Amino acid sequence: MDKQKAIAITTEIFELYTRYGSSDYIGEPVSQLEHMCQAAQMAAAEGADDEMVLAAFFHDIGHLCEFIMPLEKMEGIGIVDHESIGEEYLLSHGFSPRLGRLVQGHVPAKRYLTFKYPEYYQRLSQASKETLTIQGGVMQADEAAAFEADPLFADYIKMREWDDRAKLVNTPIPDLDFLKEMAIQHLMNQN
């Protein structure tokens, strides 16, 4: 992709964050923008590659898509299938299939972890517990086996870990320029 198109797409996507990111994050103690910035910062601090850092930042973009398209809501706790909506949105804008799959994979990772480690459920925020049922509930053994066999399995689990931890109050929002530049470079590297 050429640089001008990559800049235009990045500007469009980051405009979603600037315009709507300060909105309520489905009952969590932080805004959507704070949550997604924290997830990206955690990924970067742990040495994740650029696709993982961007996926951590974009993992809940499906919730922001409600402001640009009609979407089904989960009774005040977010957007139904936000993970798939986010994946489709990013793919349609030229992001890599791996990045899209990482965004999509953070919800199945929650379902998997509640299957594999029943105590994990107790660590979920109230909002995350409420959405779990709508998102398919605890995985069944056959689903879990297939999920474990996915080549991105370990990355999905990391994405979920950052998602769970990225709810710290009073954490300043960083300058988004480093993420914008990362997104532009990522898009320019796509065919």
Language-model segment annotations:
Residues 1-191:
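Metal-dependent phosphohydrolase cores
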